[in-house]
Amino acid sequence: MSTLGHQYDNSLVSNAFGFLRLPMNFQPYDSDADWVITGVPFDMATSGRAGGRHGPAAIRQVSTNLAWEHNRFPWNFDMRERLNVVDCGDLVYAFGDAREMSEKLQAHAEKLLAAGKRMLSFGGDHFVTLPLLRAHAKHFGKMALVHFDAHTDTYANGCEFDHGTMFYTAPNEGLIDPNHSVQIGIRTEFDKDNGFTVLDAGQVNDRGVDDIIAQVKQIVGDMPVYLTFDIDCLDPAFAPGTGTPVIGGLTSDRAIKLVRGLKDLNIVGMDVVEVAPAYDQSEITALAAATLALEMLYIQAAKKGE
């Protein structure tokens, strides 16, 4: 079984076209790409509503609505003229085999990073971030984590494959440094003694964006950063199509402004996860995810253009 694919060898979940109508490249390791997009159609680790395996397809589908804008507002340049971005399709694995997915995703990421590429990944449920962190830590060493979510995902329930345990496991494996990591938008129960800085949704909504970004920069410092965005960080009014929605979240406007504010960080890997299109309304969740992913690429392009 191949590692990467498209709708003809993985017809349940993938697309024939790339994110933002970018070129598809199923051999990205030898390409001249700066950033490689990988879909991870996996939702076996979810504790809420299933369907996140269809997230990558939904994000790609709605991203066609974003492809027409060249000098994107408010950046006033075209990201595609500064970054070489390709979409390598979806990870292909035996559906029902969480271990195979994890091992194949980590191996794929390690191969890309060794070839000098950077990764933007689409989940799938949030568990997919753990094998990505393992690969990135092998390449970059211990990292800071900037994590947007309604949940901290630091729960120790003893389950090997669970979308609520990754950031309990990752510090224990030495992948991330919680003392240089920040979790944004949290509005569920969390452990206050694990080293992470938690900026709950209430204070994120009440404080100024510049104030929050200044604090994030101070916490992270100059460490390599992994950026992960669980779409349930947004209020369900803006992102109903997700497995574990929680009211009282961020607006899409505030989330975009916060992501733009991360431009000066040393971001080495990124993902957007937990889009479950079966529960979406008029594709607004997928559109929010696609827009946030595009903004992530724009902050990389902005740095390259400086």
From Swiss-Prot:
Cofactor(s) it depends on: Mn(2+)
PANTHER family reported for this sequence: ARGINASE/AGMATINASE (PTHR11358), GUANIDINO ACID HYDROLASE, MITOCHONDRIAL (PTHR11358:SF26)
Family matches, as Gene3D superfamilies: Ureohydrolase domain
**Function, in words:** Catalyzes the formation of putrescine from agmatine.
According to the UniProt record, what class of enzyme is this?
Answer: hydrolase
Any one Gene Ontology biological process term?
spermidine biosynthetic process
InterPro entries named in the record: Agmatinase, Agmatinase-rel, Ureohydrolase, Ureohydrolase_dom_sf, Ureohydrolase_Mn_BS
GO MF terms here are: agmatinase activity; manganese ion binding
SUPFAM superfamilies named in the record? Arginase/deacetylase (SSF52768)
Annotated EC: 3.5.3.11
Family the entry assigns: Belongs to the arginase family. Agmatinase subfamily.
Name of the protein in its database record: Agmatinase
On whether Hydrolase is a keyword of this UniProt record, the answer is: yes
Q: Where does Mn(2+) bind?
A: 126, 149, 151, 153, 230, 232
Reactions mediated catalytically: agmatine + H2O = urea + putrescine
* Pathway info: Amine and polyamine biosynthesis; putrescine biosynthesis via agmatine pathway; putrescine from agmatine: step 1/1
Q: Which organism is it from?
A: Enterobacter sp. (strain 638)
Sorted keywords for this record are: Hydrolase, Manganese, Metal-binding, Polyamine biosynthesis, Putrescine biosynthesis, Spermidine biosynthesis
